[in-house]
Each structure stands twice: as C-alpha cells, then as structure tokens.
C-alpha cells in the first residue's frame, strides 16, 4: 500500500514538473526571432472579449517588397505619415497585439506558423514602420508556434 502511494506521489510530482517546464518553455518561445514573416502572410489583430479570442485580418505582408499592405477596413483607422512609409494605427484597448500568420499543408500534416508581433507603444498608438527596418513601434518580436498537427484528410476541409 505504501509503495503504491509512493509511486502515485512520485508520478504526480513528475507530471507537475513536466507541465511547469512546458508552460515556461512556451513563454520563453516568445523571445525567438525568425528572419521575417513568410510571403503573403496575413496580418491579424487579436481581440479578446469575455475570454474568447477573435481575429480580424488587417492586411498582408509582401516579403519581396518588404511592405505591409493594409486592407480597406484597417485603413479607416490608419493614417500614413508624410513619407508614406509609416502608418499610425490606433488600437482599441482590447487589441494589444498583431499577428503574422502563415499556413502550409504537407502530405499528411497541417502546419501553421504564428508570428506574434508585440509593439512597445505609448498609449494605444502603434506605429507600423516600413518593415525593411525590422521595427514596429520601436521593437518587433516574432514568435513561432506549431499548431496542432492533424491528418491530411481533415486539413483539406
């Protein structure tokens, strides 16, 4: 009886350690810096309301031209500067981050790469600077996450 209890206790401790390390690894993953977003990836804004995440595409990124093209609805809230290279996009308080997302489909696996861009801004104003400079509101952070892999048949839906 004592051996079984001891084994269960050790198993629980190991599970807690693994979960803790996994969570910490996920947080630290946000410090990785890939070269740049993928060609034609969609720039997304993230809005969290009542604990549910909602996304809205605000534009696309062209890796060859190193430019971010914003769609019409996003441009309603964005104003180009005199140089034409910078945009100022005022964010609602509920949209703290921008997302660059790109998905690829293999033979049997579906892989989605999420590039998280967090800007350091004053107030709720985010400056989208020409991406040749690699800066966004002073700093740019890209994180890669691998979405859940599913079978090719489910990915074709």
Regions found by a protein language model. Name each.
Residues 32-39, 49, 100-110, 152-157:
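Structural signature of eukaryotic scaffold interfaces centered on beta-propeller domains
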């Amino acid at each position: 009886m004592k051996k079984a209890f001891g084994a269960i206790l050790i198993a629980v401790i190991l599970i807690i350690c693994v979960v803790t390390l996994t969570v910490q690894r996920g947080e630290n993953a946000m410090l990785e810096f890939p070269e740049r977003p993928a060609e034609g990836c969609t720039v997304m804004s993230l809005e969290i309301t009542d604990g549910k995440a909602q996304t809205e595409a605000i534009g696309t990124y062209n890796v060859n031209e190193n430019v971010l093209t914003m769609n019409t609805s996003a441009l309603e809230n964005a104003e180009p500067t005199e140089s034409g290279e910078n945009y100022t996009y005022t964010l609602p308080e509920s949209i703290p981050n921008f997302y660059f997302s790109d998905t690829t489909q293999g033979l049997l696996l579906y892989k989605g790469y999420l590039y998280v861009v967090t800007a350091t801004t004053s107030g709720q104003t985010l400056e989208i600077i020409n991406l040749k400079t690699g800066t966004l509101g002073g700093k740019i952070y890209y994180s890669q996450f691998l979405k859940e892999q599913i079978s090719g048949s489910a990915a074709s839906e």
